[in-house]
Curated annotation (Swiss-Prot):
CDD domains: FGGY_EcGK_like. ADP binds at residues 13, 17, 267, 310, 411, 415. It comes from the Bacteria. ATP binds at residues 13-15, 267, 310, 314, 411. Key enzyme in the regulation of glycerol uptake and metabolism. Catalyzes the phosphorylation of glycerol to yield sn-glycerol 3-phosphate. Keywords: ATP-binding, Glycerol metabolism, Kinase, Nucleotide-binding, Phosphoprotein, Transferase. Belongs to the FGGY kinase family. Its EC number is 2.7.1.30. Homotetramer and homodimer (in equilibrium). GO terms for molecular function: ATP binding; glycerol kinase activity. Pfam families: FGGY_C, FGGY_N. This is Glycerol kinase.
């Protein structure tokens, strides 16, 4: 009998990927395809939803070819996706009526300002666990309905569908038969009540979005639909697991118990802590979000978003040309023992959790005549760890959970110097797993559970393997001193507002 696999579709911000996993949770093969980014105005970011779809199809074909397996060896498909990115399409033609508005896009700032002025902040925060911010899907849907000719009329007539990227891909893979999303993605829209687990009529009224546009919301591990055979090499394969990228990473890191946390170091950083079956309302600028719905239970998480992390390293490479490649940052930073008092606050697009200060801009402090390129690079790396501590402290204050370990993933975790400093500044153990593609692995696990490929979460938890552990080597006195310097730098950055 031929070996069976789970296929994970990992649809990200700059590329789509298809990754094959075997029963041990190991990567068998992967394929990746980048797609075009559109920047029609400053601060706006858009994608072509059809190009995303064709990139996914290309990755599926490529990964099957590279692995030399047949489509009938795929037991189930999991989908994980860039969250909040918004697609609106015509129900009759299946064609998007506008480009996909990406999570990073700030084109709905005007709408957000109006909602705040109208006094809706508390209602939205109370029901969704989120803030009024262009980041989330609801204002993006409203923008499309308000700005695309004829869109509002078509929506009122029940002729338009809205979906996050998971919804769009399921719709296409199922041949237009299925319009669904999962709890984790729905919880990022600004339209979903995370307590009642329903689309909220009051929120829809505030945003002026017709309910007929919205997908059905289902658990994160369930057979939603089968692929139509003409999109999957003659096979009808169950699409059986869905989660937004950060929730999928939490699941892939096997953070199944209350109080377990992970940090993903990508373009930005996303720190999530499992808070169990009760949502925790944050008083410290964190988001309350749904982690997943599995085994008939919905579990929640606290989330902190750091806007600039890996992109600060890219800036050193592409903007300042201080390094030739991202890995070189570790070698350079290792040549000095400290930053010699230099702090870099990478508020290039404002500051995220816990500050939510969109007006802040990047700054460097503590420069002297003796400051070298090495100090500057080290300060940039350390800024990732300091921002993570900002979020972690907010989490501890909200949850009263004393975190002992942090599981990490994402591109920057290969940097041993950064991971050691992260452990030092947090005062906790940092664990780096063998399989670092935890986002794709999480969606594969969700799909595999639904089709019986894996028995339960206990079996999955045993597959999590630690590649390297970083233990705190810094005194509390030293870490506290360094962190106070960071806090002063952030305070100074936020107080500098230059009005042109």
């Amino acid at each position: 009998m031929s070996e069976k696999f789970i296929l994970s579709i990992d649809q990200g911000t700059t590329s789509s990927r298809a990754i094959l996993f075997n029963h041990k949770g190991e990567i068998v093969e992967s394929a990746q395809k980048e797609f075009e980014q559109f920047f029609p105005k400053p601060g706006w970011v858009e994608h072509d939803a059809n190009e995303i779809w064709t990139s996914v199809l290309a990755c599926i074909a490529d990964v099957l070819r590279k692995a030399d397996i047949e489509a009938n060896q795929i037991e189930g498909i999991g989908i994980t996706n860039q969250r909040e990115t918004t697609v609106v399409w015509d129900k009759n033609t299946g064609r998007p009526i506008y480009k996909a508005i990406v999570w990073q896009s700030r084109q709905t700032e005007g709408i957000c300002k109006e909602l705040k002025e109208q006094g809706h902040e508390d209602t939205i925060r109370h029901k969704t666990g989120l803030l009024i911010d262009p980041y989330f899907s609801g204002t993006k849907v409203k923008w499309i309905l308000d700005n695309v000719d004829g869109a509002r009329e078509k929506a009122e007539a029940g002729e338009l569908s809205f979906g996050t990227i998971d919804s769009w891909l399921i719709y296409r893979l199922s041949g237009g038969k299925t319009h669904v999303t999962d709890y984790s993605n729905a919880s990022r829209t600004l339209m979903f009540n995370i307590y009642d687990l329903k689309w909220d009529d009051e929120l829809l009224e505030i945003l002026d979005v017709p309910k007929s546009m919205l997908p059905e919301v289902k658990p994160s591990s369930e057979v939603y639909a089968n692929t139509v055979s003409y999109h999957f090499f003659g096979e009808e394969v169950p699409i059986a697991g869905v989660a937004g990228d950060q929730q999928a990473a939490l699941f892939g890191q096997a953070c199944f118990d209350q109080g377990m946390a992970k940090n993903t170091y990508g373009t930005g950083c996303f720190l999530l802590m499992n808070t169990g079956e009760e949502p925790v309302r944050s008083k410290h600028g964190l988001l309350t979000t749904i982690a997943w719905g599995v085994d008939g239970k919905v579990e929640y998480a606290l989330e902190g978003s750091i806007f600039v992390a890996g992109s600060a390293i890219q800036w050193l490479r592409d903007g300042l040309r201080l390094i030739e490649s991202s890995p070189q940052s570790e070698a350079l930073a290792s040549q000095v023992e400290t930053t010699d008092g230099v702090y870099l606050v990478p508020a290039f697009v404002g500051l995220g959790t816990p500050y939510w200060d969109s007006d802040a801009r990047g700054a460097v402090f503590g420069l002297t005549r003796g400051t070298t390129k090495e100090h500057f690079v080290r300060a940039t790396l350390e800024s990732l760890a300091y921002q993570t501590k900002d979020v972690m402290d907010a989490m501890l204050a909200d949850s009263d959970i004393d975190l002992k370990k942090l599981r990490v993933d994402g591109g920057a975790v290969k940097n041993n110097l950064l991971m050691q400093f992260q452990s030092d500044i947090l005062g906790v153990t940092v664990e780096r797993p063998v399989v670092q593609e935890t986002t794709a692995l999480g969606s594969a696990y969700l799909a595999g559970l639904a089709v019986g490929f894996w028995k339960d979460k206990e079996e999955i938890a045993k597959q999590w393997l630690n590649e390297k552990t970083f233990e705190n080597e810094m005194s509390e006195e030293e870490s506290s001193y360094l962190y106070k310097g960071w806090q002063k730098a952030v305070e100074a950055t936020r107080s500098f507002k230059f009005e042109s």
